[in-house]
């Protein structure tokens, strides 16, 4: 049986069918894919392009009067206004302060702007409510352990507190990680989320 059929090799997986006739046909009539080549860019090229684009956008922010701006080595921007040269380093620093403040706000609260979070805001609020109620009940139980009251057991607060805290923490952390795109966390796995 093996003599009548040719052996399969890994090269056979890259052959095109006979219907696919293209410019890459071999003398045997079988088209083959060429070798794969990946183009790598040096890190310094990417960093240089990123730096230039950042400077370009910062210069656009700082240049209200339409003057041509170019980066200075000391971090300022010199602009040429009919032969006069002025350094706008103070405006540059204010611009960077406001953009860094904006970035920190966006990093903190950007996950609330996700479309699935806004669509399922009730589920997200319920998750936070479970978390907070669980914490309040557990802290009440701890308070009763520290200063016992006759006739009231702290277990009455500990048990429901943990029952509310565990799913609350789970959902809040899961939602946050899914928004941030961490591996293994997807909204698909939360059954209460409408996709």
Curated annotation (Swiss-Prot):
The chain crosses the membrane at residues 123-143, 155-175. It comes from the Eukaryota. The keyword Phosphoprotein applies. Its main location: membrane. The keyword Ribosomal protein does not apply. Keywords: Cytoplasm, Membrane, Phosphoprotein, Transmembrane, Transmembrane helix. The modification Phosphoserine is found at residue 93. InterPro entries: TMEM134 (IPR039714), TMEM_230/134 (IPR008590). Residues 1-122, 176-195 are cytoplasmic. It is a multi-pass membrane protein. Pfam families: TMEM_230_134. Residues 60-91 are annotated as: Disordered. Residues 144-154 are extracellular. It is found in: Membrane; Cytoplasm, Perinuclear region. Belongs to the TMEM134/TMEM230 family. PANTHER family: TRANSMEMBRANE PROTEIN 134. This is Transmembrane protein 134.
């Amino acid at each position: 049986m093996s003599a009548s059929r040719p052996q399969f090799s890994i090269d056979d997986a890259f052959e095109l069918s006979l219907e696919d006739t293209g410019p890459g046909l071999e003398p045997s009539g079988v088209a083959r894919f060429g070798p794969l080549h990946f183009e790598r860019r040096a890190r310094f090229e990417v960093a240089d392009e990123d730096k230039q684009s950042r400077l370009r956008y910062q210069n656009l922010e700082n240049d209200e009067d339409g003057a041509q701006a170019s980066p200075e080595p000391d971090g300022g921007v010199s602009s040429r206004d009919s032969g006069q040269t002025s350094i706008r380093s103070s405006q540059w620093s204010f611009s960077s302060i406001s953009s860094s403040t904006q970035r920190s706000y966006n990093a903190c609260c950007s996950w609330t702007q996700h479309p699935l979070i806004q669509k399922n805001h009730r589920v997200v609020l319920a998750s936070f409510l479970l978390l907070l109620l669980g914490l309040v009940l557990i802290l009440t139980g701890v308070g009763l352990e520290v200063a016992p009251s006759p006739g009231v057991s702290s277990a009455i607060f500990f048990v429901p507190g943990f029952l509310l805290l565990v799913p609350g923490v789970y959902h809040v952390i899961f939602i946050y990680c899914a928004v941030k795109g961490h591996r293994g966390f997807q909204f698909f796995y939360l059954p209460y989320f409408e996709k």
